[in-house]
Amino acid sequence: MSKAQTLSAADRAKLEGLIGHDFAEKERLDRALTHASARTEKGGNYERLEFLGDRVLGLCIAELLFRTFGTAGEGELSVRLNQLVSAETCAAVADELNLHLYIRTGADVKKLTGKRMMNVRADVVESLIAAIYLDGGLEVARRFILRYWQGRAVRADGAKRDAKTELQEWSHAKFGVTPNYRVDERSGPDHDPRFKVTVEVAGIKPETGVERSKRAAEQVAATKMLEREGIWQQSPAGN
């Protein structure tokens, strides 16, 4: 949905069924689906909700991992957490919910493709989590998150060691050097930044990673290099 109208009663009921929550304040659901490019009478969009939803998701996923992987150390838990709150995972949840049918955007956003459109879908999922939290409380938000993330948490390739640690040990053994990470670009608003990080190991081609934190972007870059060099098996798309 690209026009700035509210959801139809039928669409709202269908989406609420997928979410598992009937909104007491229907406007919250509408706002969670409204991109800043959409012109609405009340001028509301999902940016503030996205800020809150990111924190609610992080808390619930951290608790899920803490309870599920009782022997995992901080490093492994961090790797799993970064995977599960990444833009890729959030966008996959958006696709599972068919949110692209309901997102309200302006004409310019309709032209977006690839990673930029993936980020929009990911942002909407975080906004939706915030709307659920504000409307129903933390337990309702947690129930939604568990519904769509618990299976992913079990499947997540977090059994791998920390990518930066693995890359450092490999580069020391093979080349006698330490990987070098640099931030090439920081973009996006303060509440939702994107970091582009490049990792370099002397003698081989560098790799880049883009994520919502510097640490997560470093992990992405390190993972890509490990997979490219055949140290790690490449993860299937969507996992």
From Swiss-Prot:
The active site is at 54, 126. Digests double-stranded RNA. Involved in the processing of primary rRNA transcript to yield the immediate precursors to the large and small rRNAs (23S and 16S). Processes some mRNAs, and tRNAs when they are encoded in the rRNA operon. Processes pre-crRNA and tracrRNA of type II CRISPR loci if present in the organism. Belongs to the ribonuclease III family. Residues 162-231 form the DRBM domain. Keywords: Cytoplasm, Endonuclease, Hydrolase, Magnesium, Metal-binding, mRNA processing, Nuclease, RNA-binding, rRNA processing, rRNA-binding, tRNA processing. It is found in: Cytoplasm. InterPro entries: dsRBD_dom (IPR014720), RNase_III (IPR011907), RNase_III_dom (IPR000999), RNase_III_sf (IPR036389). GO terms for cellular component: cytoplasm. CDD domains: DSRM_RNAse_III_family (cd10845), RIBOc (cd00593). The gene is rnc. Its cofactor is Mg(2+). Its EC number is 3.1.26.3. SMART domains: DSRM (SM00358), RIBOc (SM00535). HAMAP family: RNase_III. Residues 12-137 form the RNase III domain. Mg(2+) binds at residues 50, 123, 126. Homodimer. This is Ribonuclease 3. It catalyses: Endonucleolytic cleavage to 5'-phosphomonoester. GO terms for biological process: mRNA processing; regulation of gene expression; rRNA processing; tRNA processing. GO terms for molecular function: double-stranded RNA binding; metal ion binding; ribonuclease III activity; rRNA binding.
